[in-house]
Curated annotation (Swiss-Prot):
Any one GO BP annotation for this protein: protein N-linked glycosylation
Quaternary structure, from the entry: Component of STT3A-containing oligosaccharyl transferase (OST-A) complex. STT3A-containing complex assembly occurs through the formation of 3 subcomplexes. Subcomplex 1 contains RPN1 and TMEM258, subcomplex 2 contains the STT3A-specific subunits STT3A, DC2/OSTC, and KCP2 as well as the core subunit OST4, and subcomplex 3 contains RPN2, DAD1, and OST48. The OST-A complex can form stable complexes with the Sec61 complex or with both the Sec61 and TRAP complexes. Interacts with PSEN1 and NCSTN; indicative for an association with the gamma-secretase complex.
The keyword Transmembrane belongs to this UniProt entry's keyword annotation: yes
UniProt topological domain (Lumenal) ranges: 1-5, 56-75
Source organism per UniProt: Homo sapiens (Human)
Pathway the protein takes part in: Protein modification; protein glycosylation
Phosphothreonine: residues bearing it: T124
Keywords on record: Endoplasmic reticulum, Membrane, Phosphoprotein, Transmembrane, Transmembrane helix
TM spans (from-to): 6-23, 35-55, 76-108
Biological function: Subunit of STT3A-containing oligosaccharyl transferase (OST-A) complex that catalyzes the initial transfer of a defined glycan (Glc(3)Man(9)GlcNAc(2) in eukaryotes) from the lipid carrier dolichol-pyrophosphate to an asparagine residue within an Asn-X-Ser/Thr consensus motif in nascent polypeptide chains, the first step in protein N-glycosylation. N-glycosylation occurs cotranslationally and the complex associates with the Sec61 complex at the channel-forming translocon complex that mediates protein translocation across the endoplasmic reticulum (ER).
GO cellular component terms, A-Z: oligosaccharyltransferase complex
Tissue: Expressed in skin, heart, placental, liver, skeletal muscle, kidney, pancreas, keratinocytes and dermal fibroblasts.
Membrane topology of this protein: Multi-pass membrane protein
Protein name from the UniProt record: Dolichyl-diphosphooligosaccharide--protein glycosyltransferase subunit KCP2
């Protein structure tokens, strides 16, 4: 199901806010065991994806369709936000958030490039049809 840019901006902003609030409400529980600290990093990675989606949708509304997110400032700003939110829980959450965010960013980039990039024409070299002389 495809939603518009404005609706996607509202949904991703709301999910970012709810995820950040949930991470702060349950920060003691997320920091209590090893597995939950890893889950805290996974939640931070989700915060990264949702905030990047909201930021890019806002740019598309302001600057027009076809505006793409670049590494600086969009991706770094959203990554720092997610790492800061994970750091408020536990130090290990920062590391796992970074790892999960990089994996998520790789797959977002892979899906985006297959959907939105035009295929470059492949040039094949022309076959030479003629006699070639051997030189010694």
């Amino acid at each position: 199901m495809v939603v518009g840019t404005g609706t996607s901006l509202a949904l991703s902003s709301l999910l970012s806010l709810l995820l950040f609030a949930g991470m702060q409400m349950y920060s003691r529980q997320l920091a209590s065991t090893e597995w939950l600290t890893i889950q805290g990093g996974l939640l931070g990675s989700g915060l990264f994806v949702f905030s990047l989606t909201a930021f890019n949708n806002l740019e598309n509304l302001v600057f027009g369709k076809g505006f793409q997110a670049k590494i600086f400032p969009e991706i770094l700003l959203c990554l720092l936000l997610a790492l800061f939110a994970s750091g408020l829980i536990h130090r290990v959450c920062v590391t796992t958030c970074f790892i999960f965010s990089m994996v998520g960013l790789y797959y977002i980039n892979k899906i985006s490039s297959t959907l939105y990039q035009a295929a470059a024409p492949v040039l094949t070299p022309a076959k030479v049809t003629g006699k070639s002389k051997k030189r010694n």
